[in-house]
Amino acid sequence: DDIIITTGGSEAVLFAFLSCLNPGDEIIVPEPAYANYMAFAISAGAVIRTVTTTIEEGFSLPKVEKFEELINERTKAILICNPNNPTGYLYTRREMNQIRDMVKKYDLYLFSDEVYREFIYTGSPYISACHLEGIEENVVLIDSVSKRYSECGIRIGALITKNKEVRNAVM
């Protein structure tokens, strides 16, 4: 019941934006990030606000204060790609909990693009946003089989959420 099949991960991102956001709403995204997020946001009338990660810090999640500097009444979501595209950075349990705490504190959506979850080479554990307690209704997970099977022409993706209102809006 929580899974909606889409024509690729890109359509899942667009559906997430269109179903959860209104024109002028803002999404905070750690950068560097997948370039097409911007196009999907524009299509939905939303605005991407970025918080910069640096190579010097290994592209780790910026401090919570950096996110909070950007949060305002128009902020409706945080978008992460885990592992990150293009850096490959894998968020730690501590970082995922920090994201969870911000989502909970400000009642935001967490759009979590997890299409690269099988591409982890460090031995570190992968933490899905769907496993973060206390924000189950806020999480919208994006998935795709294209990367997993090296078949980018196979346009099969999914939008996964426990939030019934979001699922109904998508359908």
Give the ranges of each region predicted by the language model.
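Short loop-beta-helix segment that forms the pyridoxal 5′-phosphate
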Residues: 1-15
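Active-site phosphate-binding strand-loop segment of PLP-dependent enzymes
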Residues: 54-124
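Hydrophobic residues at beta-strand termini and immediately following loops
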Residues: 6, 51-52, 129, 142
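A short helix->loop->beta-strand "cap" motif at the edges of active sites that frequently abuts
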Residues: 25, 46, 105-109, 135-137
